[in-house]
Amino acid sequence: MAEPGRPAREAPAASSRKTHRAPRRPRPSRSASGASEPPLRSSVQPACDSAAGTHPVGNTVAMKQKKKKTPNRVSGTNGSEKPSEKPAPDEAPPSAEAQAEQLARELAWCVEQLELGLKTQRPTPKQKEQAVGAIRTLRSEKTPLPRKRQLMRSLFGDYRAQMDAEWREALRALKAATHSAQVQLVSEATRKKSGRVCRPRPAERAKTTPDLTSEEFRFNFF
């Protein structure tokens, strides 16, 4: 119902305002096949898109896997692969002849030490008897080799180390003697002072002995 004092025409005007709506935008027309058009893209694409276009994602994954599978190889100067260095072979054991020579040197050294001890020291009769028996045992060809080595070790301990130390000491003394005996150049002044003057001898010199005669020597007492 209309209020008193207002015309009845305003009511439909208010209802017309409420029902008034904005016009809708026209929808894009679809093709006959019913497929929707692809969205519009800008003509300028970023650099990453171009790079992605040249290298697909699948190729990059395959390249990474290939890099992981290939081992790192050291190449030589000419581009060829450097062969792996083989471990150095172990030194060959000494021959039987070398072992026999080494044993002969060790036996000679031990016998020499025993003989030197008998000459330079004053052993008791018991010690002298033991040293003579050891020398006889070491020189005997019937004595087995293990028995000789056991005897040498019981007498001298580590005789090989003692032989090595003695050899080094002798080599050091020999080097010192060689160094001290080197010929040194003498200066010209020293050479003139110590030089001898050689004078020619006279052609005719007096005879020191009298002439021998064929006459018989006699005492002239009368």
UniProtKB/Swiss-Prot annotation:
Residue positions where Phosphoserine is found in the record: S75
Domain of life: Eukaryota
Location of the region described as Disordered in the Swiss-Prot/TrEMBL record: 1-103, 119-146, 186-210
Modified residues (N-acetylalanine): A2
Omega-N-methylarginine: residues carrying this PTM: R27
Biased composition (Low complexity): 1-16, 29-39, 93-103
Keyword annotations of the record: Acetylation, Methylation, Phosphoprotein
Bias (Basic residues) ranges: 17-28
InterPro entries the record matches: DUF4615
Classification via Pfam families: DUF4615
Family label: Belongs to the UPF0488 family.
Name under which the protein is recorded: UPF0488 protein C8orf33 homolog
